[in-house]
């Protein structure tokens, strides 16, 4: 009996110890506030560091930074900025688990007489409530002094309304070895990052002269790649110290034309892939045929040109590609026997806005229309007088139909067989019916815009949607009023482009040529256009 009691007591003690150990371990892992206690709203505090913060004559390979509570590192890969950049990424713990210290193992050979900054951004948080230790830095110098000068400023996008996040801002020392090509092949001396803001600050800089550059550094390698990266720069070399804040306008450089690939897509159609920005391509066969003709349209969203051609072409085509001052040659093998069938569409899908024309387009560029095979009537089946134009733009060739629109009316447009013909001679085989309506003027709004403080002409005034879709563009060479009428109710933006070189389009900058992008100014507020409403706005350009 006594033995049974002892066994039960021992079992009870073991169970109790097991439960207590689980509770203890859980509390150790959690390190949280007592249930019902006040919420912890304090950020972690650095207690000490080995070697100490602001150490000079630094020679260590490992740094340990201690805090007053358990911390975690969040988004360290994007938040941490080491200046000057290191060739090899340091090993940093903890990552994913809580700890009372940060360990940094340096794998590089450090530069002599240089101040290094480890800026953790917003990555250091406490383990329980996620309170952020904002802009936490650890600084040391391999020389006798800690450099203490700084440079700051903001970034903006040269064309878009909002700037990108995580812009890398860099300083290159301007010395006797300096060349502009340094940004393509060497890491900068000092760096900072805007993170999720538009502001930046580079600290712990030594006195001197520097090239100041900002990058949307896609590869995160501190090197400028014009194919992928946006760049902004200050044209003149800057001096530190100087009581100046700098704004970097980031843009994508326009790459020179480069032919990349040529392939047959269908019979009498080939694709030309290219690099760069171009407005037109001319195709010239090198060895005939004499009856060769072609038409080129560009894709809207990728660097590809669609080329339709006709003539007595055999099983291959050797041709010259000309664009501007660039000439290249290419060859395409012609094996396809299948030609595209013509497919017709119009822009009036349900409702035709009062400000729009009817646009008849095809998957193959349209070349003619037979008006005897077009039937256009209103809701009373009365014939609608119209005029038409054959138009070719950069991305499409189409038939545009204009007519006097009646308000709140219904229309039917019928294309009988052979009404429209494409570049290759195909015509629509079936009868095509398109029904659409118009609305009342009171269903639309109007915007009347006045510009003030225009520095120079010509300018390009654009009305766009919040998504960046171009609604209307006005090219102005002198002071005038800008009337945007019959606008569907939605939200719009206005931007003004200074066309400095008078080529009727926006031009980007170029780093090596030290050309800044043409200036773009957005109206500061979104314009909410409402039905049956006139809006008058004055835009003061700064």
Where do the protein language model's features map onto the residues?
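Compositionally biased, intrinsically disordered linkers/stalks adjacent to structured regions
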Residues: 257, 365, 369, 454-455, ...
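Intrinsically disordered, low-complexity terminal regions enriched in Ser/Thr/Pro/Gly
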Residues: 446-447
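Structured interaction patches on ligand/partner-binding surfaces of diverse proteins
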Residues: 134-135, 217-254, 333-340, 424-432, ...
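Acidic, low-complexity Ser/Thr/Gly/Pro-rich repeat segments typical of extracellular/periplasmic
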Residues: 9, 27-215, 227-233, 252-443, ...
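Short, flexible beta-strand-to-coil junctions
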Residues: 175, 216-219, 275, 454, ...
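Short beta-strand and adjacent turn/loop elements
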Residues: 411, 415, 486-487, 493-499, ...
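C-terminal structured domain segments across diverse proteins
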Residues: 426, 454-464, 492
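Sec-dependent bacterial lipoprotein signal peptides
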Residues: 1-28
């Amino acid at each position: 009996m006594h033995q049974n009691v002892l066994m039960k007591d021992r079992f009870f003690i073991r169970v109790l110890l097991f439960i207590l150990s689980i509770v203890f371990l859980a509390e150790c892992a959690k390190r949280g506030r007592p249930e019902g206690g006040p919420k912890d709203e304090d950020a972690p505090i650095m207690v000490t560091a080995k070697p100490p913060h602001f150490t000079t004559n630094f020679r260590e390979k490992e740094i340990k930074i201690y805090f007053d509570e358990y911390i975690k590192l969040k988004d360290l890969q994007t938040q941490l900025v080491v200046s000057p950049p290191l060739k090899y990424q340091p090993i940093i713990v903890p990552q994913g688990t809580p700890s009372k210290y940060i360990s940094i193992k340096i794998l590089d050979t450090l530069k002599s007489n240089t101040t290094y900054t480890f800026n953790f951004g917003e990555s250091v948080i406490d383990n329980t409530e996620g309170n952020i230790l904002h802009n936490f830095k650890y600084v040391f110098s391999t020389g006798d002094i800690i450099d203490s000068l700084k440079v700051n400023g903001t970034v903006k996008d040269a064309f878009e309304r909002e700037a990108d996040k995580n812009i890398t801002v860099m300083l290159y020392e301007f010395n006797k070895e300096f060349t502009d090509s340094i940004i393509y092949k060497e890491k900068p001396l000092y760096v900072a990052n805007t993170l999720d803001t538009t502001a930046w600050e580079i600290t712990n800089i030594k006195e001197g002269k520097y090239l100041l550059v900002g990058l949307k550094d896609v590869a995160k390698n501190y090197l400028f790649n014009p194919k992928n990266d946006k760049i902004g720069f200050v044209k003149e070399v800057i001096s530190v110290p100087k009581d100046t804040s700098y704004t970097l306008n980031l843009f994508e450089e326009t790459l020179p034309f480069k032919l990349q690939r040529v392939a047959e897509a269908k019979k009498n159609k080939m694709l030309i892939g290219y690099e760069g920005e171009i407005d037109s391509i001319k195709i010239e066969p090198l060895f005939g045929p004499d009856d060769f003709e072609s038409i080129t349209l560009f894709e809207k969203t990728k660097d590809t040109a669609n080329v339709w051609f006709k003539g007595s072409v055999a099983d291959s085509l050797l041709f010259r590609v000309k664009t501007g001052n660039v000439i290249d040659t290419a060859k395409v093998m012609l094996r396809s026997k299948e030609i595209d069938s013509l497919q017709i569409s119009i822009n009036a899908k349900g409702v035709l806005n009062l400000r729009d024309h009817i646009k008849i387009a095809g998957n193959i560029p349209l070349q003619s229309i037979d008006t005897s095979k077009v039937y256009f009537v209103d809701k009373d089946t009365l014939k609608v007088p119209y005029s038409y134009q054959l138009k070719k733009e950069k991305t499409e060739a189409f038939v545009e139909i204009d007519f006097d629109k009646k308000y709140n009316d219904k229309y039917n447009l019928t294309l009988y067989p052979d009404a429209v013909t494409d570049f290759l001679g195909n015509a629509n085989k079936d009868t095509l019916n398109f029904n659409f309506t118009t609305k009342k003027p009171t269903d639309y709004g109007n915007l009347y815009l006045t510009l003030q403080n225009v520095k120079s002409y010509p300018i390009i005034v654009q009305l766009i949607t919040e998504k960046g879709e171009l609604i209307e563009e006005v090219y102005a060479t002198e002071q005038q009023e800008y009337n945007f009428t019959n606008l569907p109710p939605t939200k719009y933006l206005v931007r003004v482009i200074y066309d400095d070189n008078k080529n009727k389009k926006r031009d980007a900058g170029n780093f090596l040529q030290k050309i800044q992008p043409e200036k773009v100014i957005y109206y500061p507020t979104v314009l909410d256009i409402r039905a049956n409403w006139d809006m008058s706005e004055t835009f003061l350009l700064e």
